[in-house]
Amino acid sequence: MGRGKVQLKRIENTINRQVTFSKRRSGLLKKANEISVLCDAEVALIIFSTKGKLYKYATDSCMDKILERYERYSYAEKVLISAESDTQGNWCHEYRKLKAKVETIQKCQKHLMGEDLESLNLKELQQLEQQLENSLKHIRSRKSQLMLESINELQRKEKSLQEENKVLQKELVEKQKVQKQQVQWDQTQPQTSSSSSSFMMREALPTTNISNYPAAAGERIEDVAAGQPQHVRIGLPPWMLSHING
């Protein structure tokens, strides 16, 4: 049969307790040295017997160095834990504070909506009524301001449109004036051309139609024979003039 599990408890017999302490102490110091050498770890071991005798082991006999390092680590750990604890406490306090504030705001909002009024007394209801009246005054004032701003903006746009309309009307009048002048010019052009054509036809008529008017031609021939200078205006051909002079 295998050995049963040994129950750890204080050894009542003083001699046995001293013997066990001596054996276990030696084994513990040996194990500390082994883990320091094998694992390249810094190990510090301090043992006080029941009589107050000190037994210790330190890697490379640097107990003070190891203890100083331990104190720095312990202090930093304590500060970190304390900071985390304070931060956590602050967050919890802030959470409770914000939660109470949110509940108060929600309660006031319900009162403004006319809900949960049973818990309010007469004075609180009067204060709520005054608060609502002040709110309505601010709302109406803001509404009036926005309406005035809107009216001013519309008036400004109206003025701008009127100015644009005046400019367009002026341009339209100028265009109509130009079109009227163009129409008058087009109407006078055919009359001038017709007058010029008629004048040219009258000037050319005696020469082109001389054979059709013998009497008029004879009279003009006599005038020429009498020495009158009208032959310049007759426009007769040269061969007729030579025949008359001959």
Curated annotation (Swiss-Prot):
Residues 180-199 are annotated as: Disordered. Signal peptide: none annotated. Residues 88-178 form the K-box domain. This is MADS-box transcription factor 14. It comes from the Eukaryota. It is found in: Nucleus. One of its GO terms (cellular component) is nucleus. Keywords: DNA-binding, Nucleus, Transcription, Transcription regulation. It comes from Oryza sativa subsp. indica (Rice). One of its GO terms (biological process) is positive regulation of transcription by RNA polymerase II. Its main location: nucleus.
